[in-house]
Regions:
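Conserved PLP-binding active-site segment in aminotransferase class I/II-type PLP enzymes
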Residues: 1-77, 98, 150, 273
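Hydrophobic/aromatic ligand-binding patch that stacks against planar heteroaromatic rings
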Residues: 94-96, 148, 172, 249
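Conserved PLP-anchoring active-site segment centered on the Schiff-base-forming lysine
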Residues: 67-123
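Aromatic/hydrophobic pocket-lining residues that form π-stacking "cages" and hydrophobic walls in ligand
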Residues: 92, 145, 209
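Active-site phosphate-binding strand-loop segment of PLP-dependent enzymes
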Residues: 111-192, 197-205
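Generic structural signal for small/hydrophobic residues in well-ordered secondary structure
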Residues: 21-22, 44, 62, 82, ...
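Active-site region of PLP-dependent enzymes
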Residues: 163-169, 176-286
Length: 286
């Protein structure tokens, strides 16, 4: 019997609308940082309620910036600990190691998110942050994790790679964390080719992340071009940074996808409920 495989990880694009958006970038002659990246940052803030939103080239870059900025601004030392989970993509824990910090693995609960008892067992005087991974868009016991961390002065980094559109009691996740990082990679629920958004609660953290993501340069090309008057050739390189900025082509795709995100997530919930219904009566499946 021939069986047609069900492809789980194929991005769904509104092709004509996406091509029109990309064409707008090309006709304007601005495909890099600025223009559409400014638009998607504003739209993302409006959609989620986050205070700051910085469009970057991947969730991985955003996680690295999140940890790098918090380490610099809060005076963390090499070897300080970040409680995390092994049940995640490697980017989550690579970012911890990039910054000379130590990942401490906690177990997961029935929601596949960090288990509270396991978390409490692993908190030490060297714990500086908890990396909460909302795998599959699940929130697990995220609110309890927040409470535990707040009462102990521990930072909360939300790896929200799967959480575009995730809400708790009607409120989008992200604003409550010290920093939340979303993925817009091709197989995520808000697909581009690859990009992401890093969202700091603190304005100074956001400002540092923006400099670091543009090679430590004080003003990006878009600011120097559209700041009034002639192009500004003079700028400072205040610190050693990275090339993590997003671009307008990816932002154009994200702006289109964002318009359909809630509808797409509703369809995912419908399919999930169908699986629950059809598999629920089978012994051994919970």
């Amino acid at each position: 019997m021939n069986r047609t495989p069900i492809q789980l990880f194929v991005p769904h694009f509104r092709i004509d609308e996406s091509l029109d958006a990309v064409r707008t970038c090309m006709e304007r002659g601005w495909t890099g940082l600025g223009f559409m990246t400014v638009d998607i940052e504003q739209k993302w803030k409006e959609y989620t309620g986050v205070k700051n939103a910085h469009f970057v080239n991947s969730n991985t870059a955003g996680l690295h910036l999140a940890l790098d900025v918090l380490k610099r601004r809060r005076g963390w030392a090499d070897g300080d600990e970040v409680i995390t989970t092994a049940l995640t993509f490697v980017s989550t824990n690579h970012a911890i190691l990039y910054c000379g910090l130590t990942p401490v693995f906690a177990d997961v609960d029935e929601y596949l998110c960090i288990d509270l008892a396991s978390l409490l067992e692993r908190i030490t005087d060297k714990t500086r942050a908890v990396m909460f991974v909302g795998i599959g868009g699940n929130v697990g016991r995220y609110l309890e994790v927040l409470e535990i961390c707040r009462s102990r002065g521990i930072a909360v980094i939300l790896d929200a790679a799967h959480m575009a559109g995730t809400r708790i009691d009607g409120h989008h996740v992200g604003p409550e964390a010290d920093v939340a990082v979303f993925s817009f990679q091709a197989v995520k629920n808000l697909p581009t080719a690859d990009s992401g958004m890093v969202c700091f609660a603190d304005d100074a953290d956001d400002a540092l992340a923006r400099r670091l993501s543009w090679l430590g340069i004080s003003k990006d090309t878009y600011e120097r071009t559209h700041g009034g008057g002639a192009y500004k050739w003079m700028y400072d390189v205040d610190e050693l940074g990275y090339k993590y900025n997003g671009n307008s082509i990816m932002a154009a795709l994200a702006l289109v996808a964002l318009k359909y995100l809630d509808d797409d997530n509703a369809e995912r919930r419908r399919i999930s409920a169908l699986y629950d219904s059809l598999l629920g009566g089978i012994d051994g499946i919970e």
